[in-house]
A protein has these predicted regions:
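Short, basic/aromatic-enriched C-terminal tail that caps enzymatic domains
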Residues: 266-282
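Rossmann-like NAD(P)(H) cofactor-binding subdomain of soluble oxidoreductases
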Residues: 45-120
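Phosphate-coordination loops involved in phosphoryl transfer and adenosine-cofactor binding
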Residues: 11-14, 81, 126
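Interdomain hinge/lid region at the active-site interface
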Residues: 208-269
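Internal alpha-helical scaffold of NAD(P)-dependent oxidoreductase catalytic cores
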Residues: 27, 99, 105, 120-212
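NAD(P)+-binding Rossmann beta1-loop-alpha1 motif at the extreme N-terminus of oxidoreductases
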Residues: 1-52
């Protein structure tokens, strides 16, 4: 009796993810939720004997991407029909150049999302993905982004390092600002375990304002209002309770001034007074 070969549904993709860190694990979980057949392999286990996939995602540290590509090429394990992509923000598709000719194409597929924990994956829906590379690989990476509910962007001529620095400034800078803000809350009387829970929704509302309103309208607070007296009180309290945060506060307030001037809610005289206050306290 001849055994019939089981057919995959037409909309089912086979994905191999090499690297089971924060990004790799989060992508695996999200793709499985869409019905994709995902194999996740930790880099510490080394390369498998063979890979059966339509798309190979290399999710290792930036410095290891090219080495992994070279090793996969030498091992001959990437199917010729498959495409290979990496998720590094600071590297373009050329990091996977050793795999050209061994597969159907290579690309960068960087999700502009903050992956802080492998155990608690962030929401990917509506996040943006930067795609760059061979047309065949970009096409399949775009399909992956679509499955995840993400927005794919090719952005021709993009300065990759500037792009990555911008992402780091916002994602890492926001986390650092929140940590300083949490410490100030604690010194002001908020329980240490409560402070992050209070700041999370605040950050979420800022993110929503940035996405929906853009700049300069997303700015709120005393600089936008031209509240010189309020800023003086803030600085006095910071000097008393958390003096090491004063330079950070001054720098953040100075960065708000051009936005406040563009909005025009405050008088130029008040904004000039704020600029003078920040200069004197610096």
């Amino acid at each position: 009796m001849t055994r019939r070969r089981e057919r995959r549904p037409k909309n089912t993709s086979r994905v191999f993810i090499y690297g089971a860190g924060k990004v790799g694990t989060s992508l695996a979980r999200a793709l499985r939720a869409t019905g994709a057949l995902v194999t996740l392999r930790a880099a510490r286990k080394g390369l498998p004997r063979r890979i059966e996939a339509d798309i190979v995602i290399v999710a290792v540290r930036d410095r290891d991407v090219r080495l992994v590509a070279e090793s996969m090429r030498a091992a001959g394990i990437v199917p010729r029909r498959a495409v290979a992509v990496h998720v590094a923000g600071a590297l373009d598709a050329e990091a996977l150049a050793p795999l050209r000719g061994a597969c159907a194409g290579v690309a960068q597929m960087h999700p502009m999302i903050a992956f802080a924990s492998a155990r608690r994956a962030p929401s990917l829906a509506k996040g943006h993905v930067r795609l760059q590379g061979d047309a065949s690989a970009v096409r399949r990476a775009r399909a992956v982004a679509r499955r995840l509910g993400m927005v794919a962007r090719e952005l021709p001529g993009l300065d990759t390092i500037a792009y990555h620095a911008a992402a780091g400034l916002v994602a890492n800078g926001a986390a650092a600002l929140a940590a300083v803000g949490a410490e100030l809350l604690v010194r002001g009387g908020v329980p240490r375990k409560v402070a992050p829970a209070m700041l999370g929704p605040l950050l979420r509302s800022v993110a929503e304002n940035v996405a929906s309103l853009g700049f300069p309208e997303a700015l709120t607070g005393p600089v936008r209002r031209g509240d010189v007296a309020g800023l003086r009180k803030h600085l006095a309290t910071l000097h008393a309770k958390l003096p090491e945060a004063v330079p950070l506060y001054l720098a953040a307030a100075a960065a708000q001034l051009p936005l406040a001037r563009a909005i025009g809610d405050a008088t130029e005289a008040n904004l000039d007074a704020i600029a003078e206050l920040l200069t004197k306290r610096a």
